[in-house]
Amino acid sequence: MTKRVRLSDSFNPVYPYEDESTSQHPFINPGFISPNGFTQSPNGVLTLKCLTPLTTTGGSLQLKVGGGLTVDDTNGFLKENISATTPLVKTGHSIGLPLGAGLGTNENKLCIKLGQGLTFNSNNICIDDNINTLWTGVNPTEANCQIMNSSESNDCKLILTLVKTGALVTAFVYVIGVSNNFNMLTTHRNINFTAELFFDSTGNLLTRLSSLKTPLNHKSGQNMATGAITNAKGFMPSTTAYPFNDNSREKENYIYGTCYYTASDRTAFPIDISVMLNRRAINDETSYCIRITWSWNTGDAPEVQTSATTLVTSPFTFYYIREDD
């Protein structure tokens, strides 16, 4: 059995148990001291066991906090020490980014929302030139236009291209005969034929009313794009520049020119061409219209009665002031 060291008469039994005569801490280990959470040095000093993030620096038990944490002076709660600067916003315990016009998220990634007329090319934003073009395609595979009143089906191909260039539209047009009835026009000395195009308020072709029976669409390679167009108003002739039913400005609604038909003997026959913009609306559905008339009056017919060939007019280009988008 081990005997304890005899304490001096000047021992103070109150912690820290100093000997008043020597100011020394005798080594004692009373039964009421547990080593859990405490430690006692050989000289009898009782201290707390502190592991990170706890510390007693400054004399009191403290929690070490990094740059992103702080202790609330009001309630003593631990909270994040994070502020947000514009355009970031802090709401509660979250940081967010308000999204303005043109921005969105896709698969939890910030992205740019591209509207009509813009596209990505090798991760760069560029202008989609195709939407500046409205056309029938380079050469439709089948007849797309019915011009002859006597025709029960489409009798020719109308190739039409409309390109927006600033405040103007550049138009490019010609016809290719398909039916024998249409091609026989070349055997007449005096003839005219008209392609009528009627459009609604958004610039969509009214195929039921128009000579052209297939809708126009944007350019996709050498073909028409797929899907319906939402707004082609910017391709239409301006109703301010070319008003409807205004006899005082009738001449301003017409464009005149010449194209040619090359006969089978290689003779070039001139064809008068006139373009009427708006001018007359046939019903309430019609907001815009373009009428293109080809005519000739020659001493001799381009072809003889027995040798009618495909009627192909040379391309004709004209310009007009366009409607606002």
Curated annotation (Swiss-Prot):
The keyword Transmembrane does not apply. Keywords: Capsid protein, Host nucleus, Host-virus interaction, Late protein, Viral attachment to host adhesion receptor, Viral attachment to host cell, Virion, Virus entry into host cell. Transmembrane segments: none annotated. GO terms for biological process: adhesion receptor-mediated virion attachment to host cell; cell adhesion; symbiont entry into host cell. Pfam families: Adeno_knob, Adeno_shaft. Belongs to the adenoviridae fiber family. This is Fiber protein. It is found in: Virion; Host nucleus. Forms spikes that protrude from each vertex of the icosahedral capsid. Interacts with host receptor CD46 to provide virion initial attachment to target cell. Fiber proteins are shed during virus entry, when virus is still at the cell surface. It comes from the Viruses. Induction: Expressed in the late phase of the viral replicative cycle. The tail region anchors the fiber to penton base capsomers, whereas the shaft, built from several repeated motifs, allows the knob to protrude from the virion. Homotrimer. Interacts with host receptor CD46. Interacts (via N-terminal tail region) with pentons. All late proteins expressed from the major late promoter are produced by alternative splicing and alternative polyadenylation of the same gene giving rise to non-overlapping ORFs. A leader sequence is present in the N-terminus of all these mRNAs and is recognized by the viral shutoff protein to provide expression although conventional translation via ribosome scanning from the cap has been shut off in the host cell. One of its GO terms (cellular component) is viral capsid.
